[in-house]
């Protein structure tokens, strides 16, 4: 199996979601490992703007030809945008997992970031699972 991608500038949860901080906004998506394990993604159910999410709690669902899985927020805060393009092209999560953010969140705590994994630590976690 090819080495899992975990680019610099991203932090990861043990549930395989990623977060990329841009100023006071956090973009959230799923990792390369997660999309590969799920297989062809056919549907993504995401929250509307204004919803509050809490760290490590569910914020939506993702469905593939193999399974349906909950999505977990790596940081908490207020959803300011959901990626509507994924409703038309959910397969983008497979082909571009780090460009296919699912939600944008504001109001997260920087202390929450300390509970996440660096790319190196995430790769080590995934290596144990493969």
UniProtKB/Swiss-Prot annotation:
Biological process annotations from GO: glycine decarboxylation via glycine cleavage system
Q: Which domain of life is it from?
A: Bacteria
PTM annotation (N6-lipoyllysine): residues: 66
Cofactor(s) of this protein: (R)-lipoate
InterPro entries, per the entry = 2-oxoA_DH_lipoyl-BS, Biotin_lipoyl, GCV_H, GCV_H/Fam206, GCV_H_sub, Single_hybrid_motif
Cofactor: binding details: Binds 1 lipoyl cofactor covalently.
One GO cellular component term noted in the UniProt record for this chain = cytosol
Q: Keywords for this entry?
A: Lipoyl
Stretches assigned to the Lipoyl-binding domain: 25-106
> Its family?
Belongs to the GcvH family.
Assembly and partners? The glycine cleavage system is composed of four proteins: P, T, L and H.
Protein's job: The glycine cleavage system catalyzes the degradation of glycine. The H protein shuttles the methylamine group of glycine from the P protein to the T protein.
Q: What is this protein called?
A: Glycine cleavage system H protein
Output the lineage of the source organism.
Bacteria, Pseudomonadati, Spirochaetota, Spirochaetia, Leptospirales
């Amino acid at each position: 199996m090819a080495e899992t991608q975990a680019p610099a500038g991203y932090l990861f949860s043990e549930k395989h979601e990623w977060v990329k901080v841009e100023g006071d906004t956090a973009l959230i998506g799923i990792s390369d490992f997660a999309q590969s394990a799920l297989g062809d993604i056919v549907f993504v159910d995401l929250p509307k703007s204004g919803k509050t999410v809490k760290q490590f709690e569910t914020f939506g669902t993702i469905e593939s030809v193999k399974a349906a899985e909950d999505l977990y927020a790596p940081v908490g805060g207020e959803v300011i945008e959901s990626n509507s393009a994924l409703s038309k092209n959910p397969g983008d999560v497979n082909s571009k997992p780090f460009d296919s953010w699912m939600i944008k969140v504001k109001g997260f705590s920087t202390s929450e970031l300390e509970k996440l994994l660096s790319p190196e630590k995430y790769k080590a976690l995934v290596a144990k699972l493969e």
